[in-house]
């Protein structure tokens, strides 16, 4: 989780992962929280085993500086529609007091990731980002 975490998102996420005993391919999920995007020389060490990066709203003007976002196999998620417009895989946006996912298929493809067809069928909670639209 990268950015100014005023609502303690990282803590809540860690709590849910621990309570639900969530693993990925049998491996324990770790949650790290950074107040800002690290400098490029720090980035490789900090994110070396990272599979998902969640950017908070405070980083929407800087997130593309993070070279990790170009790494194959890393899912980039951001709070706010700007992230999907600028190449992230998923933006999380509020619409009519509901949370929606804005999916950028090109963002997935550029990182060698695939979007689940089950996720795409959730039309009430998912929109596809289209360039120019």
Each PLM stretch: what is its role?
Residues 1-133:
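Short hydrophobic alpha-helices and adjacent helix-cap/hinge residues
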């Amino acid at each position: 989780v990268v950015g100014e975490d005023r609502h303690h998102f990282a803590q809540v996420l860690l709590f849910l992962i621990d309570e639900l005993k969530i693993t990925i391919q049998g491996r324990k999920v770790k949650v790290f929280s950074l107040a800002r995007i690290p400098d490029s020389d720090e980035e490789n060490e900090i994110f070396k085993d990272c599979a998902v990066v969640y950017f908070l709203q405070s980083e929407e003007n800087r997130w593309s500086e993070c070279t990790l976002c170009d790494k194959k196999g890393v899912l980039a998620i951001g709070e706010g529609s700007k992230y999907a417009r600028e190449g992230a895989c998923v933006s999380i946006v509020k619409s009519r007091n509901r949370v929606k996912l804005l999916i950028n298929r090109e963002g997935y493809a550029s990182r060698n990731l695939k979007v689940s067809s089950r996720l795409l069928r959730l039309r009430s909670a998912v929109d596809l980002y289209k360039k120019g639209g």
